[in-house]
């Protein structure tokens, strides 16, 4: 592996990923040819067919009034990458797809902590997908491309960052798996990290069990238990190392010198010393208050007092006083956890807050549930509908439709604040996607449960891990809606605090893992680790850390601790509901039938005439798939059965015979007679000469109008299948009725009589 100058000023480095019997993948980085005015630009290739351009730029002057690092990541999906024209009205790309937004988050999470602290210049990384092999996923390539372009941009960046997707296929962890290979995987995860002196520091993990995991495990595949997931993280490290080395070699030849950027530390040492001297005692006491609101009110009071006491001494440096106060709060919270193993709300490190689960909360919803964990409160609401209501996806990913949709809402009142409401922000999209992935492996197939499912999670109150609360509320709500889940799923958020502690005159690194973290513990801790799963295996996992790597034994311990908490939560959820409820009376009843593929056109009819007619007459909704699967949905079973009977009459017809009698509906009149509907798609003609019951009539409309019911008998069927009808004598019709002959529903166009000619 080395850098090659392929032409003047154009450099290339290569990383070869060896998957053993699964083959090799080649990731190539090139710079110097495209986007030359960007601070750093790299084109990343995956096996030559997939091509992404990443360009990193920085503003010339800092935004010193910001109290955060203004990093922006954008992913641009170009439809020409797949040889397609966008399906929008204007035929050009518009707002980013969900896949693009989730990829932005995958890039941001490992890159952001890699920049020097205090940087306030605006940094923008734009990744453009220019070519995509349909067998590949571009998200992990984008992580490496973004890191490589930033590494050569002359920024204070301590990268590079390597990103890899590894999937557990036939007991082997395979890097950069193809879409086809993922069909055989039981677990799939994206891992990003940095190369250290003797190891790889894991910075970010996004993982999930596949939707085939239950079937594959039942067939003998290895279940993705906590131990297996930990092995997968270790398996990802050599691949990340190779990717980081390729980026480092490219930067060694092509990187700009690191420029001097002004840094704006949160506070000066003199400010921190002053704040600590006046606030430590009062703040330490306030941080033992268990209730969030009461604790926050008290710490706010102390902050105001500190600002008042130090305002004259540090005039014009009020922002630094606020930063120092926050840093002191962080130090005290962490100190108590590390030394006393007690947290700010008084819990031990493995304690879970009070749990509550309840179903059937929203009256007319198809399914609903309320899940509470301490001050975190999530309302889950399930809606069922026809499969045709599945979300259609127009993106570069392999997924074209989505039957299960999970939408997460985080209104400002959930934290007692005001703010914008409306379209979801990136965080809400990311949290919804995480909860969706957690539940996908346990959802029934469309054959088992022919419904589109929309799950909405409303974060009504937030103090720690609303995303994992959404997983729990969704499981409860889905069961309440009657969805036959393969297993219930629960989630928990874990945290980590670490520091060097003096023990018997020696300094040792101490790690303390926290179960069920609060919002403050998330902000002040070293790791945010969300884990969801059943009682038997992990279904989804998300990890972000601020440390340069977490020891394997610490991570394995956190996974085991998370499982213990998950089992406890599942037991509480089972008390509320442990099996699917009866479906709501307000939910549609959907039945599936099969028709021959060559009969689909007849069921639909010219310009949809036949299917629209059935829908209007029965009130049922009908959806037909290309393979002949027909989904019939209705508010009651009778309407659904009526629609099914009509569809079967067309697709699997029993041809009427001479002598059969029907109560038919006049559907058309002409100068020569009246057409009467006998069965769906099967009409017969009563000639004008047969309409007068032996009397001559001048106009058909004098005796038969469209919509009239006529008792008719089949007199003849010619060799072309045309049916000639005659009216049944009134006395015969009355006699048949008195003898109990079947009288069809007025809604039905026709139904065969029980009597036939000769009876």
Swiss-Prot record:
> Which GO cellular component term is one of those annotated?
cytosol
Q: Which organism is it from?
A: Mycobacterium sp. (strain KMS)
Q: Where does this protein reside within or beyond the cell?
A: Cytoplasm
Region listing for Disordered, in residue ranges: 734-759
User: Which protein is depicted?
Assistant: Polyribonucleotide nucleotidyltransferase
- What cofactors does this protein use? Mg(2+)
PANTHER family found in the cross-reference section: POLYRIBONUCLEOTIDE NUCLEOTIDYLTRANSFERASE (PTHR11252), POLYRIBONUCLEOTIDE NUCLEOTIDYLTRANSFERASE 1, MITOCHONDRIAL (PTHR11252:SF0)
What's a BP term from Gene Ontology annotated to this protein? RNA processing
Which keywords does the record carry? Cytoplasm, Magnesium, Metal-binding, Nucleotidyltransferase, RNA-binding, Transferase
Q: What is the lineage of its organism?
A: Bacteria, Bacillati, Actinomycetota, Actinomycetes, Mycobacteriales
Please report the stretch or stretches of sequence annotated as the KH domain.
Answer: 588-647
Q: Which CDD domains would you find in this protein's record? A: KH-I_PNPase, RNase_PH_PNPase_2, S1_PNPase
């Amino acid at each position: 592996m080395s850098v090659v100058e392929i032409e003047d000023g154009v450099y290339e480095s290569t990383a070869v990923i060896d998957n053993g019997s699964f083959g090799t993948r080649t990731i190539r980085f090139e710079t110097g040819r495209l986007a030359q005015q960007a601070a750093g630009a790299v084109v990343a290739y995956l096996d030559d067919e997939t091509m992404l351009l990443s360009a990193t730029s920085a503003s010339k002057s800092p935004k010193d009034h910001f109290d955060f690092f203004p990093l922006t990541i954008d992913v641009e999906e170009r439809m020409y990458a797949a040889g397609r024209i966008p399906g929008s009205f204007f035929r050009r790309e518009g707002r980013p797809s969900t896949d693009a937004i989730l990829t932005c988050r995958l890039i941001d999470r490992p890159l952001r902590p890699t920049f020097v602290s205090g940087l306030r210049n605006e940094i923008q990384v734009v990744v453009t997908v220019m070519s995509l092999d349909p067998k590949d996923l571009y998200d992990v390539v984008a992580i490496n491309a973004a890191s490589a372009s930033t590494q050569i941009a002359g920024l204070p960046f301590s990268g590079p960052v390597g990103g890899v997707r590894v999937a557990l296929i036939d007991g082997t962890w395979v890097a950069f798996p193809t879409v086809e290979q993922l069909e055989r995987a039981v677990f799939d995860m994206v891992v990003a990290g940095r190369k250290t002196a003797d190891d790889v520091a894991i910075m970010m993990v996004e993982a999930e069990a596949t939707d085939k995991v239950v079937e594959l495990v039942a067939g003998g595949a290895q279940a993705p238990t906590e131990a297996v997931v930990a092995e997968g993280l270790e398996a990802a490290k050599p691949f990340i190392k190779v990717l980081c080395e390729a980026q480092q070699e490219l930067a060694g030849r092509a990187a700009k010198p690191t420029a001097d950027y002004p840094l704006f530390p949160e506070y000066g040492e003199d400010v921190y010393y002053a704040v600590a001297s006046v606030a430590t005692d009062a703040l330490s006491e306030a941080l033992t208050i268990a209730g969030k609101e009461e604790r926050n009110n008290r710490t706010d009071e102390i902050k105001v007092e500190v600002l008042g006491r130090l305002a004259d001494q540090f005039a014009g440096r009020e922002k630094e006083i606020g930063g120092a106060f926050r840093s002191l709060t962080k130090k005290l919270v962490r100190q108590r956890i590390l030394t006393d193993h007690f947290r700010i709300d008084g819990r031990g490190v493995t304690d879970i807050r009070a749990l509550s689960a309840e179903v059937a909360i929203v009256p007319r919803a198809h399914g609903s549930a309320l899940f509470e964990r301490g001050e975190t409160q999530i309302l889950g609401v399930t809606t069922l509908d026809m499969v045709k209501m599945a979300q259609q996806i127009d993106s570069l990913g392999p997924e074209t439709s989505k039957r299960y949709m999970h939408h997460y809402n985080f209104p400002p009142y959930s934290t007692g604040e005001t703010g914008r409401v409306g379209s979801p922000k990136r965080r809400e999209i990311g949290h919804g996607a995480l909860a969706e992935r957690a539940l996908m492996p346990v959802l029934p197939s469309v054959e088992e449960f022919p419904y589109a499912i929309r799950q909405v999670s409303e974060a009504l109150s937030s103090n720690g891990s609303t995303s994992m609360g959404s997983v729990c509320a969704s499981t409860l709500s889905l069961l309440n809606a009657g969805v036959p889940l393969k297993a219930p799923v629960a989630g928990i958020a874990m945290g980590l605090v670490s520091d060097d502690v003096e023990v018997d005159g020696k300094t040792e690194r101490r790690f303390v893992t926290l179960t069920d973290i609060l919002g403050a513990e998330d902000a002040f801790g070293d790791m945010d680790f969300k884990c969801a799963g059943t009682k038997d295996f992990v279904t989804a996992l998300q990890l972000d850390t601020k440390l340069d790597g977490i020891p394997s034994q610490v991570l394995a311990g956190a996974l085991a601790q998370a499982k213990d908490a998950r089992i406890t939560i599942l037991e509480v959820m089972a008390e509320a509901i442990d099996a699917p409820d009866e479906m709501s009376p307000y939910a549609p009843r959907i039945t599936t039938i099969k028709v021959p593929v060559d009969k689909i056109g007849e069921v639909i009819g010219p310009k949809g005439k036949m299917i629209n007619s059935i829908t209007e007459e029965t009130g049922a909704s009908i959806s037909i798939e290309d393979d002949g699967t027909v989904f019939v949905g209705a508010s009651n079973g009778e309407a659904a059965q009526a629609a099914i009977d009509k569809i079967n009459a067309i697709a699997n017809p029993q041809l009427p015979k001479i002598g059969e009698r029907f109560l038919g509906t006049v559907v058309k009149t002409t100068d020569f007679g009246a057409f009467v509907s006998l069965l769906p798609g099967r009409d017969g003609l009563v000639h004008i000469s047969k309409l007068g019951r032996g009397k001559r009539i001048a106009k058909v409309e004098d005796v038969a109008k469209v919509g009239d019911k006529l008792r008719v008998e089949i007199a003849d069927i010619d060799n072309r299948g045309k049916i000639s009808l005659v009216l049944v004598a009134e006395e015969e019709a009355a006699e048949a009725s008195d003898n109990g002959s079947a009288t069809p529903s007025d809604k039905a166009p026709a139904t065969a009589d029980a009597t036939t000619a000769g009876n």
